[in-house]
C-alpha cells in the first residue's frame, strides 16, 4: 500500500542531498541527477513527475549519441564495458566512456558541446576489459567570476589517474594535481605491477573527493592495501586516508578496497563505505587475524576519514562476496518513530537494514553455523550473519539441476553437481570443487537498489547464479599454467593454492540450475516485508525465447520517480522498462542497442522530463557491445 506524500520538508531534504549542483530556475528541487546515484544518499530517486503511470506508454526517443568508444575485443583493444551513469548538472548531461573520454551533451537535443580526450593507453591492466562507470561533478560554493574550473568534472582511469576538467569547456584544470591530472598510484606500495584502477567516479562531498579503487585482489596474497582517499577537490591534495587493514593483517594480506560507489549523510558529514573482501579472494589461510572492515559496510567521518562504526556482513570472506554497492540512506518511519537508516544490498541476496548512526540492525539478524573448510591452512569462520527480515532475495538452497540443460548436455549437469561439494550457503572453496550459490555474480550486483523515501519502498533487481570454485594445489597450478593460464584460473600468489572460478553451465552455455535467473523486488521498509516480487527480463538464446517466468541475469540498477515509476535496463534482452512501483507491472518497454547495464538517470530541463540510458552491453549478459547514450521523453 502506498503512503501519502510527506511534507515539503522531505522534498527539501532530498534537494539538499543532491550534492552541490543547482536545479534550473523554476524546477522542483531534486530534479537534477548530479551524482552517480542521483543524490549523495544513493537513493536513485527523483522528484521529477511529468512522466506518470498514465502517460509513460507515450515515451519516445528524444535523442541519442554514439561515442565511438567501443570494442568487441577481437582486435588490439580489449572489450569495452560501457557502464556509466549519465549525470545532469550545470544544464549539461555528462557521460564518461570506457576510453576515459568525457562527453558534454545538450540535455534536450543531444548535441555534443565538447569532448575531453585524455589519450589514455587502452589497456585493461587489472580488469577483463575497458571499464568506466562515469564521472563526478563539483562546483565552488563561492565561485570566482572570470576564473576557470569553478565547476569541474572528474574521471578516473584504469592506470590510476584522476583527471579534472572545466565543466564549461572541457579543458584541464591546471591547479589540480599536475596540470589537471593526479597520479593516485603515488600512494600504492606495490604499484609497479598492481595499479589502483579508478573505475568508479569519486564521491563529492562539499570540497572533498572521496576516492576508492579496484585491483587484482584474486591475483596475490599481499595485494595493495584497500586505502580510501579524501582529496581536496581543487588541488587534489591528500586530506586523509582510511586504511581497512589492521597492521598485523597487512603483513600477510591486502585489499579490502572500496571499488564501488559510496553514499553520504550530507547533514551529518558521514560517508558510508561498501568494503570488499581481503586478498586473496578465495583463500584465507594467510589472514587468520580478524579484519573487521573486510566485506563490511563502514561509516567514516567525511572530514577526517576516521571510523565511526563498522558492520561486517561476511566473516573471513573466501567467496568474493564483496560489499559491492553504495548503501541507500533513508529515514524509516516505524512504530511512531523516525529511524535514520540505510539499506545495504549484497551478493548473498541479503538486505541489511541498519541504523546509519550506530550500525545496529533494525530488523532481526543472527549468527548461524556454516560449513567448514578442509583446505590446507584454512580456518573459516564457524558462523555467518543471517538476516531474518527481509527474507533473502536468493533462497538459502540452490534450486537443483535444470532438466533442459541436463538433457542438452547428456546428463553432464547432474553428474557434475553430484561430484561437487555443496552444503548450502557459505560452503567454502575446495580441492574437489564447490558448488557456490549464490555465486559472486549473483544476488545484487554493483548497481544496488533504489529507495522511495515517501512511500518507504526499496526496489532492487537480483540474479540467481551458480558457480564452481575449485582450489588448485600450487604445484599443479604452476605446472598447468607454464605456457598459458586458462581464462577462469587465478593465481592467488603466496598461498598454497590457485583457484578456478567458472559458471556452472553446460557446453552450450546453458545454466545447469533451475530458473528463475533474475527478479525485481519491492520491500516495505517500515515492516521489512516483501510487497511484490516479479521475474525480471527476458532471455533470447539457443534459438528461442525463454518463458517470462525465468527472468534474466541482471546487472545495473533501477531508479524511482515521484510518480511511482521505476525505470530500469539491466537485463539480457536489450530492452529498457518503466514499471509501476505499486504492483511491479511493466508499463512501457523501449528497445536499445545492447543490454543497458548502467543505472539510468532522469532530469527536468526547460519544463520537460528526460530519462537517459547508457546501452553498452556486458559479456556476462550478451557478447554484444555498444556505445549508445539514449534519452526518452514524452512527445
Regions found by a protein language model. Name each.
Residues 24-72, 88, 521:
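Mature N-terminal segment immediately following signal peptide/propeptide cleavage
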Amino acid at each position: 500500500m502506498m503512503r501519502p506524500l510527506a511534507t515539503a520538508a522531505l522534498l527539501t531534504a532530498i534537494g539538499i542531498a543532491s550534492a552541490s549542483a543547482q536545479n534550473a530556475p523554476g524546477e522542483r528541487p531534486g530534479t537534477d541527477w548530479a551524482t552517480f546515484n542521483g543524490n549523495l544518499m544513493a537513493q536513485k530517486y527523483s522528484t521529477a513527475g511529468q512522466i506518470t503511470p498514465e502517460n509513460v506508454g507515450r515515451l519516445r526517443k528524444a535523442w541519442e549519441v554514439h561515442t565511438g568508444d567501443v570494442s568487441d575485443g577481437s582486435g588490439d583493444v580489449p572489450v569495452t564495458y560501457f557502464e556509466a551513469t549519465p549525470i545532469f548538472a550545470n544544464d549539461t548531461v555528462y557521460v564518461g566512456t570506457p576510453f576515459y573520454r568525457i562527453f558534454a551533451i545538450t540535455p534536450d537535443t543531444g548535441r555534443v558541446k565538447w569532448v575531453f580526450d585524455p589519450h589514455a593507453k587502452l589497456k585493461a591492466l587489472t580488469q577483463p576489459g575497458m571499464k568506466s562507470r562515469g564521472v563526478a561533478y563539483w562546483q565552488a560554493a563561492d565561485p570566482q567570476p572570470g576564473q576557470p574550473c569553478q565547476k569541474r568534472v572528474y574521471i578516473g582511469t584504469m592506470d590510476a589517474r584522476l583527471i579534472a576538467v572545466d565543466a564549461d569547456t572541457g579543458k584541464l584544470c591546471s591547479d589540480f594535481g599536475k596540470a589537471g591530472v593526479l597520479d593516485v598510484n603515488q600512494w600504492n606500495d606495490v604499484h609497479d605491477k598492481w595499479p589502483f584502477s579508478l573505475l568508479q567516479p569519486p564521491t563529492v562531498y562539499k570540497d572533498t573527493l572521496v576516492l576508492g579503487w579496484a585491483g587484482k585482489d584474486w591475483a596475490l596474497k599481499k595485494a595493495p592495501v584497500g586505502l580510501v582517499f579524501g582529496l581536496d577537490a581543487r588541488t587534489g591534495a591528500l586530506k586523509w586516508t582510511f586504511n581497512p587493514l589492521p597492521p598485523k593483517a597487512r603483513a600477510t594480506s591486502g585489499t579490502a578496497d572500496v571499488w564501488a560507489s559510496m553514499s553520504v549523510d550530507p547533514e551529518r558529514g558521514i560517508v558510508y563505505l561498501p568494503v570488499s573482501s581481503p586478498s586473496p579472494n578465495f583463500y584465507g589461510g594467510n589472514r587468520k587475524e580478524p579484519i573487521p572492515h573486510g566485506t563490511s559496510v563502514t561509516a567514516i567521518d567525511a572530514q577526517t576519514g576516521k571510523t565511526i562504526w563498522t558492520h561486517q556482513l561476511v566473516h573471513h570472506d573466501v567467496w568474493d562476496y564483496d560489499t559491492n554497492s553504495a548503501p541507500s540512506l533513508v529515514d524509516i518511519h516505524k512504530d511512531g518513530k523516525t529511524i535514520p537508516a540505510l539499506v545495504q544490498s549484497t551478493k548473498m541476496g541479503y538486505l541489511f537494514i541498519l541504523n546509519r548512526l550506530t550500525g545496529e540492525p533494525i530488523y532481526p539478524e543472527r549468527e548461524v553455523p556454516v560449513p567448514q573448510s578442509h583446505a590446507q591452512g584454512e580456518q573459516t569462520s564457524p558462523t555467518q550473519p543471517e538476516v531474518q527480515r527481509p527474507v533473502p532475495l536468493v533462497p538459502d538452497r540452490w534450486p537443483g539441476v535444470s532438466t533442459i540443460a541436463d538433457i542438452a548436455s547428456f546428463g553432464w549437469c547432474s553428474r557434475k553437481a553430484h561430484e561437487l561439494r555443496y552444503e548450502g550457503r557459505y560452503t567454502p572453496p575446495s580441492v574437489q570443487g564447490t558448488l557456490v550459490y549464490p555465486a559472486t555474480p549473483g544476488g545484487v550486483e554493483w548497481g544496488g537498489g533504489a529507495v522511495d523515501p515517501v512511500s518507504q519502498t526499496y526496489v532492487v533487481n537480483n540474479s540467481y547464479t551458480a558457480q564452481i570454485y575449485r582450489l588448485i594445489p600450487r604445484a599443479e597450478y604452476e605446472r598447468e599454467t607454464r605456457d598459458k593460464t586458462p581464462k577462469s584460473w587465478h593465481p592467488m600468489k603466496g598461498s598454497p593454492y590457485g583457484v578456478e572460478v567458472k559458471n556452472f553451465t553446460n557446453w552450450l552455455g546453458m545454466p545447469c540450475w533451475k530458473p528463475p535467473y533474475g527478479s525485481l523486488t519491492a520491500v516495505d521498509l517500515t515492516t521489512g516485508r516483501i510487497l511484490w516480487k516479479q521475474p525480471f527480463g527476458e532471455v533470447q538464446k539457443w534459438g528461442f525465447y525463454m518463458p517470462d517466468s525465468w527472468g534474466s541475469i541482471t546487472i545495473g540498477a533501477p531508479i524511482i520517480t515521484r510518480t511511482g515509476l521505476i525505470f530500469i535496463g539491466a537485463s539480457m534482452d536489450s530492452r529498457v522498462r518503466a514499471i509501476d512501483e505499486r504492483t511491479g507491472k511493466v508499463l512501457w518497454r523501449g528497445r536499445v542497442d545492447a543490454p543497458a547495464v548502467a543505472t539510468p538517470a532522469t532530469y527536468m530541463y526547460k519544463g520537460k522530463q528526460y530519462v537517459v540510458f547508457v546501452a553498452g552491453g556486458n559479456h556476462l549478459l550478451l557478447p554484444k557491445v555498444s556505445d549508445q547514450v539514449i534519452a526518452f521523453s514524452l512527445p
